[in-house]
Amino acid sequence: MGVSLLWALLQDMVLAAIPALGFAMVFNVPVRALRYCALLGAIGHGSRMLMIHFGMNIELASLVASIMIGINWSRWLLAHPKVFTVAAVIPMFPGISAYTAMISVVEISHLGYSEALMSTMVTNFLKASFIVGALSIGLSLPGLWLYRKRPGV
């Protein structure tokens, strides 16, 4: 890994920790857990960035990163997993894709139908939907696998 990739990774992780910390405060996370929410947000977003850099598509990278966020942190700190995971996953939500899809909807209603606008809208809407679905599945899988009270069979 080059120096520029490491710098970009560090920058991405710091900038992802800030909204994770902010949303953790909005969700009234205990003060002792705030640093872990920021750390998880940074780890999740940084790992997703590395996976995308090395050729994985954003949907699958979001799934793997959200699974990584959901594993084992609550057992170490004796807290419910959602205390850490929800605030840490929020920086990975697809704001640009959702915004572009909504702008395309507004332009279609204002300017009328065009194939380019419709293609942009559908592409960005599906991309945002699949990323949100991957994040929600990735958050729920560790809870189903690791924190299950009854046996699976």
UniProtKB/Swiss-Prot annotation:
Tell me yes or no: is Glycoprotein among this UniProt entry's keywords.
no
The topology of this chain with respect to the membrane is: Multi-pass membrane protein
Q: From the UniProt record, give one GO term of the biological process aspect.
A: succinate transport
| Keywords tagged on the record | Cell inner membrane, Cell membrane, Membrane, Transmembrane, Transmembrane helix, Transport
In which broad location class does this protein mainly occur, judging by the first location in its UniProt entry? membrane
- GO cellular component terms given for this protein: plasma membrane
| Subunit structure comment from the entry | The transporter is composed of YjjB and YjjP.
Q: What is this protein called?
A: Probable succinate transporter subunit YjjB
Q: Which organism is it from?
A: Yersinia pestis
The UniProt gene name for this protein comes to yjjB
